[in-house]
Regions:
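All-alpha RGS (Regulator of G-protein Signaling) helical domain and cognate RGS-like helical scaffolds
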Residues: 1-167
Length: 167
């Protein structure tokens, strides 16, 4: 298998803890509670999930493209969500989730280039300039370990999927 995915699974657990911390802080119900992977309240998300799983199962290159797409969606969503809140704790979590998604996108991009050439993935939700600025920059350090057990999140469909299911 591809190491990209096993590494990201570990960071996703930490990312889920960060979001759980915010849900607890603000006494919000977890919209993913009791749901299996791919189960969403919104049928549009269920359809997207099924489409991406099918696409990613075709080959390693397709799986990497799906991973890049999900990270790209997360980055676009997190950029918007960060602009929409004034709460420092929420901004902090979103900023760290976004950093994780940028690092994951770099990883997918680098592996795609190794496996299939320089133009393997074309961004769909970020401009080419935004995408290039991310993938041609150094991996970012930081993290979420210092905030009361909060972790980080990218790759889960942070804005799009978090409202109704599990990726």
């Amino acid at each position: 298998g591809l190491r990209n995915f096993s590494n990201i699974v570990q960071s996703e657990r930490q990312h889920q803890r960060a979001v759980q911390g915010l849900l607890q802080t603000y006494r919000l119900t977890d919209p993913t509670a009791g749901k299996r992977a791919g189960e969403f309240t919104d049928p549009e998300f269920t359809q997207l999930y099924q489409q991406l799983v099918t696409q990613g199962a075709r080959s390693n290159v397709d799986a990497l493209k799906v991973g890049a797409l999900i990270e790209e969606l997360d980055i676009a969503d997190l950029n918007q969500l960060t602009r929409q809140t004034q709460r420092a704790d929420i901004k902090w979590v979103y900023t760290n989730l976004n950093r994780g998604s940028r690092n994951h996108l770099r990883s997918f991009d680098m592996t795609l280039k190794r496996q299939s050439g320089a133009s393997a993935y074309q961004p769909q939700h970020l401009s080419q300039a935004e995408y290039d600025a991310i993938v041609y920059s150094a991996p970012e350090r930081g993290g979420m370990g210092g905030m009361g057990g909060m972790g980080g999140m990218g790759g889960m469909g942070a804005g799009r999927g978090a409202g109704g299911g599990r990726w």
